[in-house]
Amino acid sequence: MLGHALAILRPVVMETGNALLADQLQSIQQNYRYLVDYFLSGTNDPRRSELIDAMIHDTYELVDEVYLAHRLQNNTDYEFREMLRPDNCVIPTYPDPESVDNADPTFRTMWLSKPDDDHLLLFRKLIADPAMEIEAYLAISGLTLSLLRSFSEKGFLALIEAAEEHYLIPIRERAWVSVLLLLLVYDDRLRFFPDIVAAVQDLLDSDDQRVFATTAMVCIVRTLGVDWANKAFYSLQKSMTPLINKLMPKTMESEKISQDELDDFSAHLDKDFQEILEENRQEMIRLTEEHLDTHFAMFKDMYSSSFFSEPFRWWLPYDPDYLPEEARKQIPIFRILHMNDLCDSDRFAFLSTLSRIGFINGQSVSELMEQAGNEAEDSEAETGSRILCNDYVRQAYRFFRLNPWKIQNPFDALFQLPDSTVFRLLYTSAADKRIIASCLMHCRAYEMAAKIYAQIADTLQSAEVYGHYGLCLQKIGEYEKALEAYKKMQQLGSSEWLYRQMEYCYFAIGDYDDALQMCELLLQIKPDSQAYLYEKANVLIKLELFAEALAILYKLDFLRPNNVTITHEILWCAFVCDDFEAAIRYFKRLEETNTTNAIDWINMGHIHFIQDKRMDAYQSYKRAMMQMADLKKFLAAFRPDRPLLVEKGIRLDEVYLMEDQLISSWSEK
């Protein structure tokens, strides 16, 4: 899969005209080639798994850089380039893409490494060095992501030190944003780390630091939305009331801000945020329509919001889906969409976070939220959340339906909604789950759909639901479970479709008697159906009722005289039924149309062998070997017929002798 991905990526990289990206791709391809060569040579490399993970990481990093290069290359109106400038970013970000490229190893080191003493020493040196301004930005971002993946008290304290000591205000604000987000994420475990709580409280004793912390809160509010921030910080206040009391009330008092002024300020922020959101959305739609978005087309609406756009991707700089399951759960977007931890299980908070999508079916999300708020208090979250999540799933899986070859891509891990806490929280009614399951099924996400149908099938007691549930199980090879669902559907009413699916499942598990019964029921509905007649003939062959199968096949041959598949079946059944004349006649028909296969030649060899025409049998068997071009395949087809040949009057020692001659002739080639 990695080699295929690199081959697909190569022309996209060449389009950028960026020599650095081309060199990175060539390096990854060479390393992959060396790895494959060592593997094929039989060399046992204990670090093979680690090397593969590293190459996957480098590939995703390269994809993200190519994506950014395409956007920069094709935005001639300067809008996107201006958006990347730090003074246009709500959350302070790095100065420019070129500088980040030069300092990227620093970011990678801090992000992908566990915060141990050596890396924290490097972090402190970067923070303390005035010449390392860009590296300090990236080190804070990288350490934040590392802490989201793997909690470390020492790493947390190092971020607090950066928020306290750095002489540059933007870097201090960046550190404060990281500290506050980590406080929110790890709210439930802070009571076990009193040193962290004490350090933050001591830091907030300073008026200057409270101003920085308040600025960081504003950054988070502008990025995630007023409603989300209010809910999240209220949740944090439950366990850290002294800290929050130091932060907001004292800041408001020192700045002499009234509650009305604060409300006006929040409304102003929200208005600005919606404008930014709409601008980003239109830009992404334009890029997608011009086929310039090579990587994130499936997130056309969600990824266009400022929550996901370039200035705010400092915590998600690369597509993180290659990370292990536990690591993904620590990244904020995954926590929001999958774990819901940041929202403290508050549904309306999750709805507010999803509001960053922008517009759904032409209606702004803010209108949907207002509409949801007009409902009863207990249902306001569920109404809007269902609308948003249903559309999110439909858009995501519409991409897979239009690009089915990407269903094996690691991106599909993003859509494991049936296993997520969010899914269980939002879709409390069976009717809602039925909508999502139907969407997943029609997008060929059968395993996910089956998980949802399993939750609701017995509750709804619907023939349609049981049918869809059985079909999903059938598609993933769970035939016994599919039959259980179909039998429950049969209790509510029978149909031709149901019999057809049950016959398929019975045949797949080798229950040919029941499969034959289903064929009889199907033929009662459509007696002249050639498809059902052919299915019955196949079942009869499996039951070794060759004479009955041959009668049906002759009928089908009359109806469809030029059907090669039916001719092959007649040849075999006629041979087993000792009707050698008919078998030879149908073989000649195949030979005249040049449609014989290796099995046909084996069958003719059997006929000649039984008729004591050993040389003709030998030549027929050799023709079969030539067509198969593989002795093992030939023997795998020939040897199961030994009992049949003995039953037809050939001694077993003669069968072995013929087999030895064939093997010898193959060895002499």
Which role fits each region the language model picked out?
Residues 457-458, 487-491, 520-524, 554-558, ...:
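Conserved structural position within tetratricopeptide repeats
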Residues 432, 465-466, 498-499, 532, ...:
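TPR alpha-solenoid repeat register
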Residues 312-493, 497-504:
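Alpha-solenoid helical-repeat scaffolds
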Residues 180-205, 609-633, 643, 656-663:
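TPR/TPR-like (Sel1-like) alpha-helical repeat modules
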